[in-house]
């Protein structure tokens, strides 16, 4: 905790110092760019006639480009902290891109398990919540199947790149290959397991991406005593794919994932459809389903239907209004939730 507090104080100091000196502003912003976000709102349960206010996220970050040279490549860093409940480090990594075809990222950052986890941040995703697939399979929040709840992040190293530049400037192929501790954030590796990930994204059009991914944890099973020198080198895996199309008129995104967790096979999918009504106003709808244990589908299947609108009158402020109908396996009747969330981004 002492280290986290030091990081938090350092972030605030950099944010305060960075704007100083008008003549040095552009130089500062190249090496040290402060940013942050604050998200909160109110949720209402019409069945219980109950509502509650909440602060969901409060984050500050410092990022910058240390090197940007056509010959020697590009070196970037990001340090991001969460201030909700107690200060904690979310992101802390360096990213070196030697050329388009090869780069390496090292530290604590969002792991490339699927599409939604890395391509959409908490301030750019169209609806308030991530899909069930992302929450349960990608260590994102309290619904995580493994109970790690690491905000979709992990500590490790990732190699990435893109190939075959097209006439309109986009690249046809993009890849990620990484090795992670698999223990979550702000923690040393507490076992001998490692999380291996691979993801391939193909862009037939600039607006269209098709993705496939596979990840697997290898190492001794925690339930097997190491003194017997007996290892179960297959603990769990994740695999799936998806598609994402976005144009000036709207977007469509869908993914399917499945995988084993401690002997149980789970699977899920989602589909999101959205339309830009005005430049500052859009509407979207999403269908989710998730089966926690495919051997007991009738008692472990959950369906969600979410519709929402997002209004962004200012570049640094937007509001989201969502309605969710939840068909949970433990409920005889579906539950309903109305959620209004506002966001400040700087």
Regions picked out by a protein language model, each given a short descriptive name:
Residues 311, 334-346:
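Outer-membrane beta-barrel "beta-signal"
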Residues 18-22:
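Sec/Tat signal peptide C-region and signal peptidase I cleavage site
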Residues 9-16:
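Bacterial N-terminal signal peptides
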Residues 1-8:
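Bacterial N-terminal signal peptides that target proteins for export
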Residues 201-294:
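Detector for outer-membrane/organellar transmembrane beta-barrel domains
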Residues 46-52, 79-89, 117, 185-192, ...:
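Solvent-exposed loop/turn segments connecting transmembrane beta-strands
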Residues 24-181, 192-194, 201-209, 272-275, ...:
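Outer membrane beta-barrel
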Residues 274, 280-320:
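Outer membrane beta-barrel transmembrane domains
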